[in-house]
Amino acid sequence: MWWTSLVFSVLLFDLIFISNCDYIHLPGNSDIPDLKLQSGYLNANENGTQKMFYFLLEARDIPVGEASLIIWFNGGPGCSSLSAFFEEFGPLYVNFGGKSLFENVHSWYHKANILFLESPIGVGFSYDTEQSNFTKVNDDSIAEQNFNSVIDFFQRKHSSYVNHDFFIAAESYGGVYGPMLSALVVDSISKREFPNENFKGLIIGNGFMNVKLSTNTMILWSAYHDRTSPDEWDEIKEKCATSGAHDVDYYDFMQFMKTTNKMDYLADNSTECGRLIEPLLGQFSETFDGYDFFNYYHDCYTNFSIPNATDPIKETLAQIPRRRISALFNKHSTDGQASYRCWADDALHKYLNLKEVQNALGIDRAWKDRKKKWEVCNMPIYDQYVMTHQDMTPFFSKIFDKFTGPAFRVLIYSGDIDTACNYLADGYFVRDLASIHGFKKTLKHGPWYHSEHKVIAGNFMRYEGANHLGSKLSIDVVTVKGSGHFVPLDRPGPALQMVHNFLTGKPGKMTNYTSPV
């Protein structure tokens, strides 16, 4: 019958469509069975010997063809962006045992398509086909790897995204990755060489964009958070004064510090000032006192991430009587998320090293044959790293000067209790950047609110200007109250609202971060 042929044809078309999409099913995912997730490898160099692993997550609440694309990088340097998927703003988190997943209702995929890149080569499942232990990279080589991978994404792997609006987004040391990659993309677009010209903006979360500002403001932040006494602070102001500084806010404390990699600075105990400021430097102090570097007010009574732990999750589970799930809750922790931050890395490490998970993700046989384990961060990369560009101002300047589109928008957001990349440094950095380019502050510092209940979520301000080509330029500086380094994890609801309102903001118009999602 004709109708049976029609039904067969429709079913065949559906099967072909599904097979062409190549959506993967994550083992242990029973909460979101219709998740549209793809994974694979992009070529990070011209000859294709460097393979960068990626996740591509399709938007849920907005049609894929209409939703913007966020291209995401974690920092480190040397840390995997899959931790952002499973621990920050992805749709699924890993349960304590490391074998199953549960839904994150505040995932950013509700409002955007998201590409997660494991950068640089050597991180996570990314690898070099010719070198089994590829760990030697720097700021410039990473920028080239990222640039080549993004081109390969648009040209070869997912050409259907070539007309999508897209934003580059990054966190922490991604405050270096993001501006450097953006400068390359803008330059390529200006030469009409880049496959997608719809580059709309840059998002930086708790960014490490200027070493001097980040290091010096850490002293200020610590001093005003009870890490010294009034008398000791007065002594610091006396002994650490530097030439030309009329106020402690402008002291160059780095003159009394030392470094081996140009990004991590320790107090120089051979100087009087160095001895005084050492307790204020937190994790980079030789007398580190054990507070959470990424969230000043967060505590874990058990450190699930100690380097010598063989299998801390297995050991903990063995101590929990059957069906007493409440025992998993950390009664001594200061968070309300079942202490997820305390054990998430270990759960994720266990999950992504399961054979069935790696098979589902399509991990290359060449990577598996090296008998390595997936790690949240590749510490040999970090240990060998020497920072090349300590100030991102020149790269922002390249972006602003060469941008040819109608408008380019920047969002700089920061958790206000992060001591790894503190909010003061980002605020000072943007203020100075705006001054260099003649931007005007069009919105003074003031609060924004989360949800229809108008709960204060932080503060924000805006700078606006234009370049010589007539492109409108804007920078929004947003703080998230009560959040540490990982804003989408610490304050998931406000983070989703903030990003959604930024993505849907209109050039030349004020973004309403208070608008509920």
UniProtKB/Swiss-Prot annotation:
A Pfam match: Peptidase_S10
GO biological processes: proteolysis
GO molecular function: serine-type carboxypeptidase activity
Stored InterPro entries: AB_hydrolase_fold, Peptidase_S10, Ser_caboxypep_his_AS, Ser_caboxypep_ser_AS
Gene3D superfamilies in alphabetical order: alpha/beta hydrolase
Catalytic class of the enzyme: hydrolase
Residues bearing glycans: 269
Active site residues of this protein: 172, 418, 485
Sorted UniProt keywords: Carboxypeptidase, Glycoprotein, Hydrolase, Protease, Signal
Residues of the signal peptide: 1-21
EC numbers, comma separated: 3.4.16.-
Family recorded in the similarity comment: Belongs to the peptidase S10 family.
Protein name per UniProt: Serine carboxypeptidase ctsa-3.2
